[in-house]
Curated annotation (Swiss-Prot):
GO terms for biological process: pyrimidine nucleobase metabolic process; pyrimidine nucleoside metabolic process. PANTHER family: THYMIDINE PHOSPHORYLASE. GO terms for molecular function: 1,4-alpha-oligoglucan phosphorylase activity; thymidine phosphorylase activity. This is Putative thymidine phosphorylase. Belongs to the thymidine/pyrimidine-nucleoside phosphorylase family. Type 2 subfamily.
């Protein structure tokens, strides 16, 4: 069988054309239906092809077009990602040929049949995924197979190990490198932007790399980008971390566990987040980033990812097993996931909340402050010079004294500060209010629905869009009182958000005794 690195046996010459289509982490090639090469090679739509140009080669999924304005008969089109990988210019000579299936396709088929896979199987699959040898169809098959027949804990370990091996691993040359991560699903919840400066001010090394939002109204990187640059070269990032003991940056530039980013591109549209994939995704990123100690936040709530304590404990045990095998010290904390954390949902609104907490502003959301202090305290207790149970008080002193604010300002300046005034944030100018339909107590806030409304309003693409919450669980409201305000930058976004609110505001009103009980470990 010919390998992907071998020279094609039959190559057909064309000229390259950049096709301005974002195919989201999938290499796509385009041929005109009347192209002589298309007919001679026996290509079909969705065929796997190998493209060579400029001394480089990629595998791509073939799309067939009928419009010569997109691709002419003598041209080979490449999607944005594919074109960038080839590092070429329009008009460059190129060859295209039938590609052999990825070498790991046999292991994928065995997983689809329900078989248990070993270490070498996962290494092969993840290598092919990271090198973009899998089409979206093959990626979806892998994600569905590992979700339908849940991976056993040994398979999760093998998958995590393979994902770490698929990219680079950072080494900070220190015995204690800490990080904090939440499994997600809770709007707001920008605790990382408070934990990092608190922990760094204590002296612990905390290189925080985060993702952008995919289906949520904002990720940590989106919110931090309101305050500073987050897309930084790895060398610059390392200098910032060594100087300031921490950073808050986008992790995409670091090439850490690249297979995870590819898998996410199909997991999110399918709404699949199986325990095994979740554990492998989170732990591979942290280990690749050089972390030695991790605090993991698992929120529980009626509309959170985890909805019961038994489910949380099962997930905890899986995380602990894999972390132990990977020599990562792990502290799992179960937290309140019944509602959003903080008052703002959307990049600017969340940045406002963070800066208010750092500045000890009386308007700061107390739930965000308290959660961040407790998580920071758990990280500080990794310090061998700190007695167990003292972390919270140390974190609180760092925040109250202004040391956390000073550290955050130093990190912002080092990454490249952007103008931001949390007293007068630039919010979307178009607004509407959602008011209580009756008097009562807020007994439920649907995390999924309020996140959906904020996203329809334009977040995170429109950084000033989102939702400003005025009331939280357990608070009494009167009929007509504003529950939250929706901000948008464009009328169409405002209309979409209004339509979603008409179906469900995400709020439930009732009696005080109807507020759901919370199980936490704080």
């Amino acid at each position: 069988m010919r390998k992907h690195t071998d020279k094609p046996q039959l190559a057909s010459k064309l000229v390259l054309r950049r096709v301005a289509i974002d195919t989201y982490r999938e290499n796509v090639a385009y041929l005109h239906r009347d192209c002589a090469v298309y007919r001679a090679e026996g290509f079909q739509a969705l065929s796997k092809v190998e493209v060579r140009a400029n001394g480089r080669h990629i595998l791509a999924t073939l799309n067939v077009v009928d419009d010569p304005n997109i691709v002419a008969c003598n041209e080979l089109g490449l999607s944005e990602d594919a074109f960038a990988q080839m590092a070429v210019i329009d008009g460059q000579p190129a060859s295209v040929s039938q590609a052999e299936p990825p070498q790991s396709i046999g292991a994928l088929r065995r997983k689809l049949a329900g078989e248990r896979l070993g270490r070498e199987d996962f290494l092969g699959i993840v290598r092919d995924i990271a090198e973009l040898h899998y089409s979206k169809i093959e990626l979806s098959a892998f994600v569905v197979a590992t979700n339908r027949d849940e991976l056993d804990r040994e398979e999760v370990y093998f998958l995590t190990e393979a994902m770490v091996a698929s990219g680079r691993t950072l080494n900070w040359h220190e015995p204690l490198v800490v990080d904090k991560h939440c499994i997600g699903g809770i709007p707001g919840n920008r605790s990382s932007m408070l934990v990092v400066p608190i922990v760094a001010a204590h002296g612990l090394l905390c290189p925080k790399t985060s993702s952008r939002a995919i289906t949520s109204p904002a990720g940590t990187a989106d919110t931090m980008e309101v305050l500073a640059k987050v897309e930084l070269p790895v060398d610059q990032l390392a200098d910032i971390v060594r100087t300031h003991r921490g950073c808050l940056a986008w992790g995409g530039a670091a090439h850490l566990s690249p297979a995870d980013d590819v898998l996410i591109s199909v997991e999110r549209p399918l709404a699949i987040d199986s325990p095994g994939q979740m554990v492998a995704s989170i732990l591979s990123k942290k280990i690749a980033a050089g972390s030695t100690h991790l605090v993991l936040d698992i929120p529980i709530g009626p509309s959170a990812k985890v909805r019961s304590m038994p489910e949380a404990q099962r997930l905890r045990r899986l995380f602990e097993y894999v972390a132990g095998r990977m020599h990562l010290s792990l502290d799992v904390v179960v937290t309140d996931g019944r509602q959003p954390i903080g008052n703002g949902i959307g990049p600017v609104l969340e940045a406002r909340d963070v800066m208010r907490v750092l500045e000890n502003d009386p308007r700061a959301p107390n739930d965000l402050r308290q959660k961040s202090l407790r998580l920071a305290g758990r990280l500080i207790e990794f310090d061998p010079d700190v007695r167990g149970g003292d972390g919270f008080a140390i974190a609180r002193d760092i925040l109250d004294s202004g040391r956390a604010l000073a550290k955050m300002n130093a990190i912002i300046a080092a990454q490249g500060a952007k103008p931001f005034d949390h007293n007068h944030p630039q919010l979307g100018a178009l607004t509407f209010d959602i008011c209580a339909s009756e008097s009562g107590v807020v007994t439920g806030i649907d995390n999924l629905q309020v996140a959906r409304i904020a996203r329809l309003a334009g977040a995170p693409k429109v950084i000033g869009a989102g939702i400003d919450l005025f009331h939280k669980l357990g608070e009494a409201v009167t009929s007509g009182e504003v529950l939250y305000r929706v901000h948008a930058g464009f009328q169409s976004d405002l209309d979409f958000a209004r339509q979603a609110c008409a179906k469900s505001t995400g709020y439930t009103l009732g009696r005080a005794e109807d507020v759901p009980h919370v199980f936490t470990e704080f």
